[in-house]
Amino acid sequence: MRVFVAGGSGVLGRRVVTRLLEAGHDVTASARSDTAAELLTRLGARPSRLDLFDVAGLRNAVAGCDAALRLTTKIPPLMKMRRAAAWRETGRLRNQGARALAEACVAEGVQVLIHESVSFVYADGGEAWLDEDSPVDDGGAMPLREALSGEANARVVTAAGGRGIVLRYGGFYAADSAQSRTMADLLQRRRLALLGPSNNYFASIYADDAAAATVAALRAPAGVYNVADNNPLRLGDYMSALAEAVGARAPRRLPAMLGPVVMGETWKYLPRSQRVSSRRLHDATGWTPSVPDARAGWRLIAAQWAE
């Protein structure tokens, strides 16, 4: 297949590009900088410097492609996530950028569009497993509102006769993720605390497994699919797993009343219990994560950091 990847140099994107190339696909990927272009070239992909909001430029990029993947995000640094303004660029990429890519795909006859979304959009599920038909709720949080509205762009391709596929990923963790590194550093310095209830489920996904799921989704029917570890951990266990992996003490506990002050915008959804199931994607493609849960995943990451 000929594949265009928007966002091919990020934590997820570079893993997806590598897997696509290993599978024998012809890959072109967008690059925002010379450094990103050099990385993509080293991987074996063709870098494309273009405006991700320009339909005409995107039409040229996807012309002749069988599939396009929108993996573009600009997640703010961990310490800035509390501010709604920090999410504006990601919101633009999830909506205006995604709309431009969807329009380009329809105009050029690209049959498959994969759109990156997040599993945080689900309402609190308590102890229940959440599938793709479970209720969603943006909670008044801009990141979730933009994520849900952005998903409509995949349906544009489906309506035109192609396959629009939305992947709702759990929170990524990876050795080369700045966010993962920051979390570990803050824990080791006793500057990262556990706010509110610790028994709520937290959906996460090891980045390598997220990439494998993304490539597998190329053969999935149109629709929405969750991408998460098979065994979601409760938030307290998730944080303890990271602490144990990096040799830190368990995080301090702070009362929930401090959540809005400390977490800001993200407090509108992070305390939810989200026991997310990826069975639908497994049934459609055979994909299964290689890392069963974040406890095993953080141990792998800590070992990579120690090398």
Predicted feature descriptions by range:
Residues 146-149, 177-184, 195-216, 223:
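Substrate-positioning beta->alpha
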